[in-house]
């Protein structure tokens, strides 16, 4: 009798232990009523400046960032249907690194919708590298207008996260 009870308890524990392994998130499928309002497939030979702005500066952006964001095609360019953003170790305007910071602010904004992007980041141990895909509020100034971090890949530590700042 004791063996039977112990067997039932162990079996139940094992089954309950497997529950977290069952996927609980279903991929959102587009409703037939949804319509595409904007996309950029980067299929030209340059960045579409009617939609994108290369933000420039080396002020740290409130995050103590060490790079200078340039508008140079060395740091951001379109090739083979993809947008490439390249960080470089180089002295530039009192900074030791350069990169690109691109935004659609003032050119594209959305109140509701599904946002989607294909993003590939380089591998390796790269301290300080922080690729991200964000959405910022249209009205007011940050941080009062909110921020939706769809993807942040901090320091390439096998971590991809998202966050809502409100």
Question: Where do the protein language model's features map onto the residues?
Answer:
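Hydrophobic core
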Residues: 10, 14-18
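Sec-dependent signal peptide cleavage junction
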Residues: 18-32
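Generic N-terminal leader/processing signal
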Residues: 1-2, 27, 118
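Bacterial N-terminal signal peptides that target proteins for export
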Residues: 1-10
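Generic alpha-helix initiation/capping and coil-helix boundary signal
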Residues: 5, 23, 66-69
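GH16 jelly-roll
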Residues: 31-166
């Amino acid at each position: 009798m004791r063996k039977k009870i112990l067997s039932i308890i162990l079996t139940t524990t094992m089954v309950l232990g497997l529950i977290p392994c069952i996927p609980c998130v279903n991929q959102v499928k587009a409703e037939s009523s949804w319509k595409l309002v904007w996309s950029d497939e980067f299929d030209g030979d340059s960045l579409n400046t009617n939609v994108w702005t290369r933000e420039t500066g080396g002020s740290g952006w409130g995050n103590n960032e060490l790079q200078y964001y340039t508008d140079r095609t060395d740091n951001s360019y379109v090739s083979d249907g993809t947008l490439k953003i390249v960080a470089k170790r180089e002295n530039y305007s009192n900074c030791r690194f350069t990169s690109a910071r691109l935004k659609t602010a003032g050119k594209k904004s959305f109140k509701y919708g599904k946002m989607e992007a294909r993003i590939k980041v380089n591998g390796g141990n790269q301290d300080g590298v922080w690729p991200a895909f964000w959405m910022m509020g249209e009205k007011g100034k940050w941080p009062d207008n909110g921020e939706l971090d769809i993807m942040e890949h901090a320091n390439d530590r096998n971590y991809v996260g998202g966050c809502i700042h409100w």
